[in-house]
């Protein structure tokens, strides 16, 4: 199944085919529009000479990688800190998973193990890890025992909470509407407190 996260067919195809690209996109999915976050792995690949390789990124000079992230258009609103986060991610992929990003989920023995593995990666807090587990389960068929339970509420069927639920322009709009409702409710609650 082809992912629909960046709104760019080429970038989405790359995310669908390259597990490292998908992990990097998820790391970058904060404080920027999701389309930018998920098109950035393709742009990073292009800036690195046409290959996205965990070992090569892990071994890069941190300043050089930050420069690559900072080239216009920048790959993120905060290019230097996110270059560091992506480099740390790649270092863990190399040291713990033999350089194979898909091994993060392919080797998971259960949903709990999968969540633990994702949660241990740089840039993945509890909520983002649950969203990524839900994305793997809902869209990529990675469903170790208990994956829906550990990714609640994002793994629930019929929801429009996160990138795990985006499969089309229509579902993207539903996710955005849901996020706007939550933000408005939080703002209303804060103003009455």
Predicted segments, located by residue:
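Short, aromatic/basic-rich helix-turn unit that serves as a nucleic-acid recognition element
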Residues: 23-27
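Alpha-helical ds-nucleic-acid-binding substructure associated with the helix-hairpin-helix region
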Residues: 48-119
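Structural motif
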Residues: 11-21, 32-34, 76-81
């Amino acid at each position: 199944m082809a992912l629909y996260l960046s709104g760019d067919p080429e970038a989405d195809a790359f995310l669908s085919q390259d597990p490292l690209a998908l992990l990097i996109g998820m790391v970058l999915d904060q404080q920027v529009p999701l389309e930018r976050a998920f098109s950035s792995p393709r742009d990073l690949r292009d800036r690195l000479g046409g290959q996205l390789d965990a070992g090569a990124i892990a071994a890069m000079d941190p300043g050089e990688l930050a420069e690559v992230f900072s080239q216009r258009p920048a790959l993120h609103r905060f290019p230097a800190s996110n270059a560091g986060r992506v480099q740390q991610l790649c270092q863990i992929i190399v040291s713990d998973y033999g350089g194979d990003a898909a091994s993060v989920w392919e080797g998971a023995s259960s949903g709990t193990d999968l969540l633990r593995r994702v949660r241990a990666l740089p840039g993945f807090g509890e909520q983002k890890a649950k969203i990524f587990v839900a994305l793997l389960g809902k869209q990529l068929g990675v469903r170790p025992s208990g994956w829906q339970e550990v990714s609640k509420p994002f793994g629930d069927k019929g929801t429009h909470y996160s990138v795990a639920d985006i499969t089309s322009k229509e579902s993207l709009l539903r996710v955005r509407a849901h996020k706007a409702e939550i933000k408005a409710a939080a703002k209303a609650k804060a103003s009455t407190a």
